[in-house]
C-alpha cells in the first residue's frame, strides 16, 4: 500500500509544479504585453484597439520621400489573453505600434507619390502577389505567344492566314516515314472483298496455343518486300500430361485407372514421365513407373527421363529411375552438354 500512495503523492506534486509553471508563463506574457502597451486591460491598449478596428483608417503619405519598398511595414494584431500562446513572447516582442514606427521606414511604390495626403493608401507593392497574378488560359493562342517560342515547335499555326477557329494541324508527309510504302503494299491486296477466305485454324487441347495452319493468298498485286513468317508447328498434349505438370496426384491416378496411356507423347515427344521429372515430383514419377511408364523412351531432343533428372540435379528422381525394373542406360547421340 505504501508504494502506490507515494506514486500518487509524486504525481500530485508534479501536477502542482506544472500548474505553477503555467501560471508564471501567463504572468510573464501579461507583463510583456503590459510593457509593450498591448494589454487589453490598460487604457492605452484600448485606445490602440479602437484605432485598429475603425474602418476609416488613413495613412499619411509624404510625397517628398522615396517610396520603394514595403519590407518595413508592420501592423498591430489584437490578441486576447485566451488566444495568446505562452510560447509566443519572442514573436510579440518584435511587434511595434504605429506610433513607434518612423515615417522614414514606411515606403510605397513609386506611383503612390501622386496620391494626395488625404486620400486612402493605395497599392503597397508594384509586383503582384502569387494570388493576384493573372491566369493564363492554355487555350488562348495570343497569351501563349509570350510564353512559348513558336520557332521551337515542330508544328505551329499560321494565324495570319487562317481565320479564328478554322486552323487545322498540318499532317506530316509520307517521306518522313520510310515504312509507309511497305504498309501500303500490305494493304493493297485487301481491297477486293471477294479475296477474303476464312482462315483454317487447327484447334489444340486445353492449355495450348492455337496456331495457324494456312493463310489465304490474295489474288491482288503483291508488293510486300518482307515475306510472311513460315507456318508454325502445331502443338498438342494430353490430359495426363496436364495433370502431371500441375502436380495433381489424384487426377493422375484417376486418369490412369480409366485407361490413360502412360507412354503417350505430346507435341515435343515427351511422355508424362518426362514432365514429372521436369517438375521434380519424384512421387508422381514412382507412381507412373508402377503404372507401366517406360523410362527408356526419349523425347524429340533424344533425352531420357534420367538425363533430365541428372541435368536438373534432382537426386530423388534419379534414385527412383535407377531403382526401376526397366534398363535406363539407353545411349543417346549428339547430346549437347554445354
Swiss-Prot record:
Biased composition (Basic and acidic residues): 1-10
Keywords: ANK repeat, Repeat, Transcription, Transcription regulation
Sequence ranges of Low complexity compositional bias: 112-130
Biochemical pathway: Secondary metabolite biosynthesis
Ranges of biased composition (kind: Basic residues): 11-33
PANTHER family per UniProt: ANKYRIN REPEAT AND PROTEIN KINASE DOMAIN-CONTAINING PROTEIN (PTHR24198), ANKYRIN REPEAT-CONTAINING PROTEIN-RELATED (PTHR24198:SF165)
InterPro entries per record: Ankyrin_rpt (IPR002110), Ankyrin_rpt-contain_sf (IPR036770)
Region (Disordered): 1-70, 112-137
Domain of life: Eukaryota
Reported phenotype of the disruption mutant: Leads to the down-regulation of expression of asaB, asaC, asaD, and asaR; and completely abolishes ferriaspergillin production.
ANK repeat locations: 235-264, 268-297, 301-330
Lineage: Eukaryota, Fungi, Dikarya, Ascomycota, Pezizomycotina
Biased segments, Polar residues type: 42-70
Organism annotation: Aspergillus flavus (strain ATCC 200026 / FGSC A1120 / IAM 13836 / NRRL 3357 / JCM 12722 / SRRC 167)
One Pfam assignment: Ank_2
Induction statement: Expressed during the earliest stages of maize kernel infection.
The name this protein goes by in its record: Ankyrin-repeat domain containing transcription coregulator asaA
Function: Transcription coregulator involved in regulation of gene cluster that mediates the biosynthesis of aspergillic acid, a hydroxamic acid-containing pyrazinone with aliphatic side chains that originates from leucine (Leu) and isoleucine (Ile). Aspergillic acid has antibiotic properties and was shown to be lethal to mice.
Classification via Gene3D superfamilies: Ankyrin repeat-containing domain
Amino acid at each position: 500500500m505504501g508504494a502506490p500512495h507515494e506514486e500518487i503523492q509524486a504525481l500530485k506534486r508534479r501536477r502542482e509544479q506544472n500548474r505553477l509553471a503555467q501560471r508564471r508563463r501567463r504572468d510573464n506574457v501579461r507583463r510583456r504585453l503590459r510593457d509593450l502597451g498591448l494589454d487589453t486591460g490598460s487604457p492605452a491598449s484600448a485606445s490602440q484597439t479602437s484605432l485598429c478596428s475603425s474602418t476609416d483608417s488613413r495613412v499619411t503619405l509624404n510625397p517628398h520621400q522615396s517610396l520603394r519598398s514595403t519590407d518595413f511595414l508592420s501592423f498591430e494584431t489584437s490578441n486576447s489573453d485566451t488566444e495568446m500562446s505562452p510560447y509566443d513572447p519572442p514573436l510579440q516582442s518584435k511587434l511595434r505600434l504605429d506610433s513607434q514606427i518612423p515615417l522614414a521606414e514606411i515606403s510605397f511604390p513609386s506611383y503612390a507619390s501622386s496620391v494626395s495626403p488625404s486620400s486612402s493608401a493605395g497599392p503597397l507593392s508594384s509586383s503582384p502577389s502569387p494570388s493576384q497574378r493573372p491566369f493564363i488560359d492554355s487555350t488562348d493562342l495570343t497569351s501563349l505567344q509570350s510564353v512559348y517560342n513558336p520557332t521551337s515547335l515542330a508544328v505551329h499555326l499560321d494565324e495570319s492566314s487562317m481565320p479564328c477557329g478554322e486552323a487545322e494541324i498540318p499532317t506530316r508527309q509520307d517521306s518522313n516515314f520510310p515504312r509507309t510504302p511497305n504498309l501500303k503494299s500490305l494493304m493493297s491486296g485487301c481491297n477486293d472483298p471477294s479475296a477474303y477466305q476464312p482462315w483454317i485454324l487447327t484447334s489444340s487441347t486445353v492449355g495450348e496455343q492455337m496456331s495457324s495452319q494456312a493463310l489465304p493468298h490474295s489474288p491482288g498485286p503483291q508488293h510486300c518486300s518482307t515475306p510472311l513468317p513460315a507456318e508454325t508447328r502445331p502443338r498438342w498434349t494430353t490430359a495426363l500430361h496436364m495433370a502431371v505438370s500441375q502436380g495433381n496426384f489424384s487426377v493422375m491416378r484417376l486418369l490412369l485407372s480409366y485407361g490413360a496411356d502412360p507412354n503417350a507423347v505430346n507435341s515435343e515427344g515427351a511422355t508424362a514421365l518426362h514432365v514429372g521429372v521436369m517438375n521434380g515430383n519424384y512421387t508422381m514419377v514412382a507412381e507412373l513407373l508402377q503404372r507401366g511408364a517406360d523410362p527408356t523412351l526419349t523425347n524429340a531432343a533424344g533425352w531420357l527421363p534420367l538425363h533430365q533428372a541428372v541435368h536438373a540435379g534432382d537426386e530423388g528422381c534419379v534414385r527412383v529411375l535407377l531403382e526401376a525394373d526397366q534398363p535406363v542406360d539407353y545411349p543417346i547421340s549428339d547430346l549437347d552438354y554445354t
